[in-house]
């Protein structure tokens, strides 16, 4: 039999982005804790609101399972002599209430010892729960931890109350000066009269009666239901970011949706300005008409009931009006000057204290863009377009709008470039180079935008690598994981024949770093990039394929992507298993540090090795050039591979590779090495399952 267990940690308001990671940690910790403690349960639920973190464990067993434990006693030579248990052994048995018949001798790394087994009765769950709760609270990590008062304890926000109930029984403990009890608190918008919770079973319904929907999924569904009702009843359509819904869910405990509006004159502002103002600044849901046009209405989610809703609506409308009036002012002021004028301000904006100004960055990126343009053999016109785009791509950082709305960098630059009369595709490049910013974003449509995006990210990463500003643990204040993820996607999802390591080396050269920033930091940076790349690939492809292609290098990502595409297709072909088996046999026999010699055909005396050499010459002549150019799919239609695989097997079955004749041995190993070198140019076949 079991009882339901409830733990509610009441806090001051937590930032919305703290909560989802926190409840995932709570779930994982709880699962591991009770499994390790051998306490069974039916299910674990974790919930969060701005003011409470909750774990609810259904049907938690009242007692640990009994466990058999093996106890080591004295050394055998002390406790067992001449076939008889000694007094030492008898005392050992008596100490644990066991008979002499229960003793046995067992070999250990330290010699032979006397052992006995006994059944250890499980402890009552109620006695274990205080340790669980305290350990849990000490183990939860937040993006920022804080300490309050004189208490030597860190948490996301100060803990103000704790509810801990096992069935109807209180679980007594103290953390951060707060004692557990059965009393919760209502939401902030109600008088703070404690809510007595009689038992864990009644918690959810009782909190709902007190205007707290504890389950975040239920809150999210309530928000969706309310906003859809408002939109449908007004013949409107919703327009919102999924992240906004997630954030608002964690900002309220009892959601109520209200419809507000703003002056239609603000609809003349760029749509993105209105959306960012409503979604990012105010957490409102924008609305559109049936044709998809943004309109001057919005939905706000209130934390509370519909009481005084007109006052709440008016208050939100007033705040939004002030925001939009500011945005209108910034926009009108900005468009008084051409975008180019704002480039003059970039020498006064710091990119990074040790890496110079934005103006410095622009000039470094210009050199990288030229380098990439030459490698890709772009036309004179394309190079001229890129030069102009580089002139302007950071200019909007000097505008009022982007100073207030940094997330609109690039987007406003594109809008202002059009207003300034810049010819296409320059505005498009300025607006697209920032993408992808997330895993969900598409890469730019214009290849020239991608060129600028690559150069910009390479410059940023090179600077941060040189200064050793790598992320530590979950902390990544600069956003290197995001920047590198964007760079990798740009290179993986295009077929640009670029060498990433060479780009970093060129960028390092452009920076003109002092000796305090050694070039070895680029190697460290490439390792960081490699780990990010591995993670990206593992989200889409099997582990063996990822390891096989990563092992042969990732400097040229266009080749890596082609390797992945090739092996995914080749695995379904007939020659795959035979070739993989033959190549792995070859791989295993080659010494790790083998240095090949020039192959001497005259030293081959077996028909099997002569045949294999002829195969190698044939393959080298017919497809090696294509393989070296990255055209790996040439192997897909190469019918000779099955026969070649048989010849490798025959070679191993009939030829003694490690001949006592040193000259013969080196010649045979050199042939195998040549074959390996050719096929390992494609991938590391030894990594494939």
Curated annotation (Swiss-Prot):
Its EC number is 6.1.1.14. One of its GO terms (molecular function) is ATP binding. It catalyses: tRNA(Gly) + glycine + ATP = glycyl-tRNA(Gly) + AMP + diphosphate. Belongs to the class-II aminoacyl-tRNA synthetase family. It is found in: Cytoplasm. PANTHER family: GLYCINE--TRNA LIGASE, CHLOROPLASTIC_MITOCHONDRIAL 2, GLYCYL-TRNA SYNTHETASE. Tetramer of two alpha and two beta subunits. PROSITE patterns: AA_TRNA_LIGASE_II_GLYAB. Keywords: Aminoacyl-tRNA synthetase, ATP-binding, Cytoplasm, Ligase, Nucleotide-binding, Protein biosynthesis. GO terms for cellular component: cytosol. InterPro entries: DALR_anticod-bd, Gly-tRNA-synth_bsu, Gly-tRNA-synth_heterodimer. This is Glycine--tRNA ligase beta subunit.
């Amino acid at each position: 039999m079991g009882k339901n267990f409830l733990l509610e940690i009441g806090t001051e308001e937590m930032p919305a982005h703290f909560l989802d990671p926190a409840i995932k940690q709570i779930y994982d910790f709880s699962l591991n804790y009770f499994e390790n403690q051998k306490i069974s349960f039916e299910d674990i639920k974790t919930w969060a609101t701005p003011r409470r973190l909750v774990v609810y464990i259904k049907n938690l067993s009242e007692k640990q399972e009994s466990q058999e434990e093996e106890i080591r006693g004295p050394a055998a030579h002390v406790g067992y002599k001449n076939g008889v248990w000694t007094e030492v052994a008898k005392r050992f048995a008596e100490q644990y209430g066991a008979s002499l018949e229960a003793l046995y001798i067992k070999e250990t790394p330290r010699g032979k010892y006397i052992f006995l087994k006994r059944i250890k009765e499980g402890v009552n769950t109620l006695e274990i729960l205080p340790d669980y709760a305290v350990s849990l609270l000490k183990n939860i990590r937040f993006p920022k931890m804080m300490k309050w008062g004189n208490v030597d304890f860190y948490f996301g926000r100060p803990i103000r109350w704790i509810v801990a109930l096992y069935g109807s029984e209180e679980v007594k403990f103290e953390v951060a000066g707060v004692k557990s009890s059965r009393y919760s608190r209502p939401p902030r918008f109600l008088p703070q009269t404690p809510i007595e919770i009689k038992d864990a079973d009644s918690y959810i319904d009782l909190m709902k009666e007190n205007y707290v929907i504890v389950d975040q999924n239920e809150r999210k569904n309530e928000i969706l239901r309310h906003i859809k009702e408002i939109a449908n009843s007004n013949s409107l359509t919703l327009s919102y970011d999924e992240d906004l819904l997630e954030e608002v869910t964690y900002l309220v405990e009892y959601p109520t949706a209200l419809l507000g509006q703003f002056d239609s004159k603000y609809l003349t502002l760029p749509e993105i300005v209105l959306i960012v103002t409503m979604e990012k600044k105010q957490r409102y849901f924008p609305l559109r008409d049936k044709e998809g046009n943004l309109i001057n209405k919005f939905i706000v989610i209130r934390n509370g009931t519909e009481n005084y809703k007109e006052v709440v609506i008016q208050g939100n409308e007033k705040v939004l009006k002030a925001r939009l009036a500011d945005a209108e002012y910034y926009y009108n002021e900005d468009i008084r000057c051409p975008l180019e004028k704002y480039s003059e301000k970039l020498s006064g904006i710091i990119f990074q204290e040790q890496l110079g100004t934005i103006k410095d960055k622009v000039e470094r990126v210009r050199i990288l863009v030229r380098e990439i343009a030459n490698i890709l053999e772009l036309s004179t016109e394309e190079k001229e377009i890129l030069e102009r785009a580089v002139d302007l791509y950071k200019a909007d950082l000097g505008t009022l709008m982007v100073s207030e709305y940094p997330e609109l960098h690039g987007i406003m630059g594109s809008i202002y470039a059009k207003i300034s009369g810049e010819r296409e595709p320059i505005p498009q490049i300025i607006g697209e180079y920032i993408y992808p910013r997330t895993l969900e974003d598409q890469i730019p449509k214009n290849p020239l935008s991608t060129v600028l995006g690559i150069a910009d990210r390479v410059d940023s990463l090179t600077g941060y690598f040189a200064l050793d500003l790598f992320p530590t643990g979950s902390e990544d204040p600069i956003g290197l994981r995001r920047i590198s993820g964007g760079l990798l996607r740009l290179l993986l999802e295009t077929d640009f024949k670029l060498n990433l390591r060479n780009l970093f080396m060129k960028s390092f050269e452009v920076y003109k770093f002092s000796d305090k920033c050694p070039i070895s930091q680029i190697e460290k940076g490439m390792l960081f990039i490699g780990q990010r790349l591995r993670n990206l690939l593992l989200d889409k492809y099997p582990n063996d394929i990822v390891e096989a292609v990563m092992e042969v290098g990732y400097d040229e990502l266009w080749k890596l992507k082609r390797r992945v595409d090739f092996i995914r297709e080749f695995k379904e072909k007939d020659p795959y298993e035979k070739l993989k088996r033959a190549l792995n046999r070859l791989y295993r026999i080659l010494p790790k540090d083998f240095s090949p010699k020039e192959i001497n055909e005259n030293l081959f005396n077996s028909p099997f090795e002569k045949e294999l050499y002829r195969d190698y010459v044939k393959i080298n002549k017919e497809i090696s050039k294509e393989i070296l150019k990255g055209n790996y799919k040439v192997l897909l239609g190469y019918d000779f591979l099955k026969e070649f695989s048989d010849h490798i097997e025959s070679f191993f079955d009939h030829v003694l590779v490690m001949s006592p004749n040193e000259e013969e041995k080196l010649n045979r190993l050199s042939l195998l090495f040549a074959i390996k070198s050719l096929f390992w140019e494609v991938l590391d076949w030894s990594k494939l399952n």
